[in-house]
Amino acid sequence: MRAMDQQEARAYVEALYEKVAQRWQERVTEGEFMQEFAAGRLPREVFALFFRNWGAYTIEINTLTACSYQRFLPFFKQHPDLMAALGDAIADEFIHPQPPGHTLIMLRTAAAFGLTREDICERPMLAECRGKLDFARALLYEGTAAEWFSLKSGEEMFGRWAGECYEILTTKYGLTPDEATFFSKHHEADLEEHDEGVIGHAELNRATLQRLLETGQAWERPTYGIEYCALTFTDLHGLVLQSTLQAARRERLLQV
């Protein structure tokens, strides 16, 4: 891909994020899971089923973000500002509030749904949740830096979604702010500067993709590419939620 000037690259990234936001609206916000959850009609046991799988997912996806530091190190060595910001973001995931990091926050929210560490760490994920994770894993090791950081556009939408979930859980499902801390923390970490100056993850992802475009290093593979990877990762989040409902019906947590 040819190098873009700063204004063109910024506009390209903004247009991509607008497409991702629209797809999230269609596949996640307007999906059955979120419609029922937002209305307070989703049984607590069904959300617990989702969170058992999602908790396991978060542990593994954070390790992939750490691996991206090594995988794309030649690029980051050219851009010490981004290298420092990514190092900060990775450290944030693993040392706050204390090692092993955000996993402790996730387990606090899991406990509010009666889930144990063993439930999260020792039970297999739903196939669709595993599929989302393994799409990211394959893209990290087989894809380009631009494809990876386009996939990471989902982090901005997840941050917004986490804020919505926090509001729903604390107003309609009786969770305390401390019990719902996984969602408030991720809303903050993804969208805001936090923990003594750590850049919001979404801002870092935008800046990295923009720099790849500006330097002519935003390479894409046939049948993959920047837009496909961004939108597919969003589609897979919707699929995870829908598959939770299907599993809940199989387990008779919901009426068929």
Language model feature labels by segment:
Residues 2-256:
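Non-heme di-metal
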